[in-house]
C-alpha cells in the first residue's frame, strides 16, 4: 500500500511538472508573436511617415519653384552677384585706359579705335564679338552667361575715411589705438555685358574648333542649357492642348444683342468664297528631258558605248566613240576629201600632187589600237589637204565654199555628254541640208554649161609634156568640188528629183535642136603627137600600159559632140558613186574597230582584258595546231592530238563566253545594228540606181545618135600615125552597164 501511494504521488508530481512546463512555453510563443506584430506596425508607421515627409518636401519644392523669381534684368543680376568679384575691370585715366590696372596690362591710348568700339558695346550692354576668344583664353568668369564689368574712374577721386590699426611702443600696453585716415579713391560702378546671338555663335565655334575631343551630345546639351538660362529664363514646358479635342474646356463667349439676332441667319452662309478646284494632270517621269531623236537604234548604240558601265579603276583617257554615220562630221569630210583629191588630180600643178600624196598617206590607219583622237586628227588633216587641192584646182570658181564642221580632238565625257551630242547632231543635219542644196545648184550649173556649142568647148593644146584634159572634166570640176560625197547615201526628196528631171529634160531638148541644125564631123585636135604624160578622163587619174585594151567611146573623147555629153555625164555620176562606195569601206571598218575597242575597254577591267587576251591567244594557237597539225615548235601532230587541240580550243571559247557574258552580248548587239545599217544602205543605193536609170532612160535617142557617130571616130583613130599611139599611154575607164544603148567595141590595133 505504501509503495502504491508513493508511486501515485510521484506520478502526480511528474504530471504537474509537465503541465507547468507546457504553460510556460505557450506564454513564450505568444509573447514572440506579439513582438513581431509590433515591429511590423512600427515599420509601417515609419514608412508612412517617410512618405508623408517626401510628399511635403515635394510640395515645398514645387511651391518654391513656382514662387522663384529668375533674375532677368541687368539690375537684378548685378544685385544678385553684388558680393562676388567682377569679371573684369576697366581703369579710366586722364590720358589713357587700362584693363585690370596691373603691371602686365598695357596702356591703351585715348585715341585708340579699339577702346572707342569697346565703349560703344558697353553703352549697348553687349559682349563684343572680338572678345569671345579672349574671354575663354584668360579664364574670365561669367555670371549667368553675362560679364560684370567694374569701371574705375580715376578722373573723379572720392575721399573716404579708412580705419588704421597702430600698436603702442611700450611692450606693457597691449591695447591698439584706432585712428581714422582720409584716402582718395576712384569712383567705381558696375555694368553688365549681355551675350548676343553672334557672340553665342562665336563661342560655339571656339569650343568646337579648339576642342581635341569630339563634340558630344552631353556637351551640346550643356551648352544649350547655358544658352537658355542666359537668354530665356521663364520656360513654359507644358504641352499645348489640342483645341479640337478639348472643346469642353473652351469658355463660352457672351453673345451680344446683334450677334444673337443674326446668328441663325449666318450659320448656313459661306463667308469666304474660294476659287474652283482645278485638277492638273500629273507629269510622267523624265518628261522634261530634251529628246530630239526618235530612233531606237541610236538609243541602243548610246547604251552600248556609254560610260555608265565603266569600272572605277578605268582610266579617264578613254573617250566616247560616236557611232551615228549619218550625223558624224567625219562622214562628209572624208567623202569630200576623197572626191576633191580626184578632181584636183586633173591640174598639173605640183602642189596638187603633193597634197594628194599626203591625203593618200593619211588614209592609212591602224586596224587595232587606234584611238578616237588619232582618227579624228587624221580626218582633220585630210580635210585641210583637200581644201588646198580645191583652191589650186578651181581658183576661178564662183560657187560659195561649203561650211566645214570644226572637229574637237577630245570629247568631254560627263553627265551632259548626251545632250551635247544631240546638239551636235542637229547642227550637222543642218549643214548637210546646206550641202545638199549646194550640190543641186552645182548640178544645175553643170547642165546649163552642157548647152555650149562644141566649137567653144575645144581649146588648142600646144603645150608639151602636159596631160590632155577633156572639156567634160573641166565642166564637172566645180560640181565635183562643191558636191560632197557623204558616207551614207541618203534619199533625195521629191522636189529635188523633180527639179533634176526638169533640168535634164530642158538640156535634152536643147541638144536635140542643135543636133538637127548642126552636122557633127571629126575635128582634128592640135598637139596630139606631143603627148607624153598620163591622160585624165572624167576627173579620174587612171594610167595603164600599152597592152591594155581601150573602150570605143574613150577614143572618141578627144572630139566631144553635143549628143554624147549626157552619156558622159551619166558615166561620171556612176564613177563618182563607185568611188564613194570604195571610200565608205575604209572609214566604216575603222569606225567598227573603234566601236569594238570601246566596248572592250568599257566592259572589262584592265586585269580582265589581260586574261581575255591570254585565253584568246591560247585558243588561236590551239585552233592553228588542230587545222595545220604542226606545233609552233615544228613538231607533227597525230590525228588524235589534232582532235584534242580542237576540243581544247572549243573549251577555251566556252570559257570566254562564260567569264565575259556582258562583252559578248554587247558585241552581238553591235553586229545586229551594223547588219541593219548595211541593209538600209543597200536599199537606198538600189533606190538611187533605179531613179538614175529612170532619168537616163529618157536620153535613149541621144545615145543612139552617139552610136551612129562611133564609126566615124573609129576611122579618125585609124588615120592617126602609129608613133603617137606608142608615145601616148592608153587610158582605161571603168565599165558601166547600160540598158540597150551601150555597146562594147575594141579598137583595131595599129600596124
From Swiss-Prot:
Q: What induces it?
A: Expression is down-regulated by flucytosine and upon adherence to polystyrene.
Q: Where in the cell is it found?
A: Nucleus
Q: Which GO terms describe its biological process?
A: regulation of transcription by RNA polymerase II
After gene disruption, what is the outcome?
A: Impairs proper nucleus dividing and distribution to the dividing cells. Leads to hypersensitivity to amphotericin B, fluconazole and caspofunginreduced; and to reduced virulence in the C.elegans and the G.mellonella infection models.
Record flagged with keyword Transcription:
yes
User: In the UniProt record, which is one GO cellular component term?
Assistant: nucleus
Q: What broad class describes the main subcellular location of this protein?
A: nucleus
Similarity comment: Belongs to the SPT20 family.
What name does the UniProt record give this protein? Transcription factor SPT20
Organism for this UniProt entry = Candida albicans (strain SC5314 / ATCC MYA-2876)
